[in-house]
């Protein structure tokens, strides 16, 4: 167990916050998937070589995805062979994979169909931040009678945290709120596109979308961490946190460890250079302040019916809690049924398998997270954390060809989940 906790501490520690402005170069970097029956051997290699991990195991023989710089490949191969670890190459050259993924398609309003829907062309590529803003603005203009651009507040660098509020008949804001957050962790680009796909389907899927909009107001935020996302497109594709400068020269707070509920604990760290740095105080980050204030306003109005925090990767759909592996939400039975219906519907589309269960038991302990805050602090009726594609050989650098399949299966899961909501 101690070795698993060490791996959790080491998650991303090597590159977690020490890159202020220069572009990160991943040419020649390998991403290796390793496993073994003694996780202490893996944690020893990670610690000794100062390696970054993309994910760590819940148990022995589970996979650990490790980023290996070119200068350390030979030593990594030697040590992992001596330790008897199983290995697979995820990315032979991470730099090449990133270049391929960054073939951004220029934005044009022609990416909207004549009736205001989202042309599939938009979902065939990842996009720059400015183009996401244009897409949201043009999409809202095409549905001006039933939508508006909203902002929850400002990021550390002064960017608006922009979303789209959509509704059906009746007055805006008169129905219980559904809030979706994407790109809380900056490098998780598939979440940006998938959340936008859901937004599009609320209008493009005429029957199902209209039925949902008659019951709920949707608040869709594809990029909840705009500074971090911009940094991934301009400087370091693997950046996770926001862009605040911390003491000691490191940058960034993990925005999903900074929510003001159960903030302290083993599911985050006080190390400002770590990728799971929880910040100097609960709710300190400007992005967290903005999100909590905005959602409190919804709770004080018609209430919050559902919240989903979309992440990648690992193909998980999780329920509260993250701060504890023994605590359960008051309506845990309902949440588990909804999560299972999501997973079943997703699998029926492209065969993609999702695992369900409480956050702490399913992926890792995570205190100061948004889902726990939603359920216990503002009494939101349902809240989930999702980890989208993949479990294969791509991880965070998912090819753009998988955007549409991810959107299709996720929308199917969302519809199924709502069918279980009383």
Swiss-Prot record:
Disulfide bond sites: 250-273
EC supergroup of this enzyme: hydrolase
Any GO BP: proteolysis
Propeptide boundaries: 17-119
Major site of localization recorded for this protein: secreted
Source lineage: Eukaryota, Fungi, Dikarya, Ascomycota, Pezizomycotina
Entry cofactors: Zn(2+)
This protein's record includes keyword Signal: yes
One Pfam family from the record: Peptidase_M14
InterPro entries: M14A-like_propep, M14A_act_pep, Peptidase_M14
Residues forming the catalytic site: 387 (proton donor/acceptor)
SMART domains listed in its UniProt record: Zn_pept
Co-factor binding comment: Binds 1 zinc ion per subunit.
Family in the record: Belongs to the peptidase M14 family.
Domain Peptidase M14 span(s) in chain numbering: 125-421
Segments traversing the membrane: none
The enzyme's E.C. designation: 3.4.17.-
Cell compartments where the protein resides: Secreted
Cleavable signal peptide: 1-16
Superkingdom, natural source: Eukaryota
GO cellular component term of the entry, any: extracellular region
Record keyword Disulfide bond present: yes
The entry's keywords: Carboxypeptidase, Disulfide bond, Hydrolase, Metal-binding, Metalloprotease, Protease, Secreted, Signal, Virulence, Zinc, Zymogen
Binding site for substrate: 185-188, 240, 256-257, 312-313
Name under which the protein is recorded: Metallocarboxypeptidase A-like protein TRV_02598
Residues binding Zn(2+): 185, 188, 311
